[in-house]
Amino acid sequence: MRKSALLLALLLGASAADAQLPFLRKRDNQPQQPVLQGIDALRADFAAQAGGTTVYYGAESVILGAPARAALTLQANWLRKHPEVVVRIEGYGDGLDTRDHALAVGARRAEEARSYLLLLGVPAAQVSTSSWGKERPGLGRAVTVLVR
């Protein structure tokens, strides 16, 4: 009889503890969303809040058009809110150029984008530039702003 009473007390105590401590209950096996950490989270937030990371130019152009300025304005707004983040603007040629011409066009595009971000109040130390010639022709007529 004592064993039965003891067993009953243990079972009741366990169920009461489960009711009082809901975090001990077994949860449904629902898939959990992966939590982005650190730089990956910043990159994802930048892309989502700034409307993407790529800014396009016209063929053989280094002048920022209205869509490019609008995209860079969104990026500048995000960067001003995150002064701890450093970005690199990578410029690209048009893909049909010679290597040297593609590097020069990419550098001018990257510098134009950087200058516009600085004009909008992004600190100079927060933005660097680089250029790709024929090494990365896939993103011709564009600059890409990369969170580092």
List each model region and its residues.
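Sec-dependent signal peptide recognition
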Residues: 2-7
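Generic anion/oxyanion-binding catalytic loop in active/binding sites
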Residues: 8, 61, 99
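Hydrophobic h-region of N-terminal signal peptides that target proteins for export
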Residues: 9-18
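Residues within well-formed alpha-helices
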Residues: 18, 67, 74, 109-112, ...
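Periplasmic OmpA-like peptidoglycan-binding domain that tethers envelope proteins to the cell wall
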Residues: 92-148
